[in-house]
């Protein structure tokens, strides 16, 4: 597929360094091994080889979502690909679902959710801070070229949105998600799933304790994902010296109806 003006593009040099661009015919990409006018990239097929002004070769690709989220500008913490994938799987995000997300943050989680729910689903992304909301919206528009119809961005307190949205899934990246857990206990439909991304142990403890106290969340799971690349060169097969360790804890829980002992 050919790349067009406005598309995101990824250039990879001979040492594997990656450069994320938004193609604009009036711009030139410059780096330590020369320059490449964007016009030399526009209209080229992804997978093409490009030569810089000094003769250096670069590989031109359309970026994966993982590339985009790792290279995107950040105004808040980013949910990295190693955590984004498990969130989509363990929270069972599927086409056609309505997902309530908070906060919007960098926009990385919003992008993953949007792709997972597809054109028949809906992501309602809620952010307290207007600057973070604007940054997230810009990231989503940069990836899609516009704000897609299946994403709605709101400014406000997500606890106030649970009842009106009635989400099948709630996904949280907030400093104090336990407040939303309390709201979800009252208003999320039974059978729904709630997921939260938390960097610290105290946040983890408070969120799990709050969920248990409500009496309507079950199958509470806490997971941490670590990623290590491996190097394969002939008979030499070994792990890389560096690995991606702790970035955050992931909590997953399922909403139930109120137990008979609590009714009335």
Give, region by region, the residue ranges found by the protein language model:
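Conserved SAM-binding loop of SAM-dependent methyltransferases across substrates and taxa
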Residues: 106-119, 185-186
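Glycine-rich helix-loop-beta junction characteristic of Rossmann-like nucleotide cofactor-binding loops
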Residues: 89-94, 116, 144, 162-164, ...
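Conserved S-adenosyl-L-methionine
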Residues: 115-122, 190, 217
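Conserved class I S-adenosyl-L-methionine
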Residues: 94-105
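Conserved SAM-binding loop and adjacent beta-strand
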Residues: 1, 71-84
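N-terminal auxiliary segments of SAM/dcSAM-dependent transferases
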Residues: 1-62
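C-terminal substrate-binding/active-site "lid" region of AdoMet-derived donor-dependent transferases
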Residues: 181-249
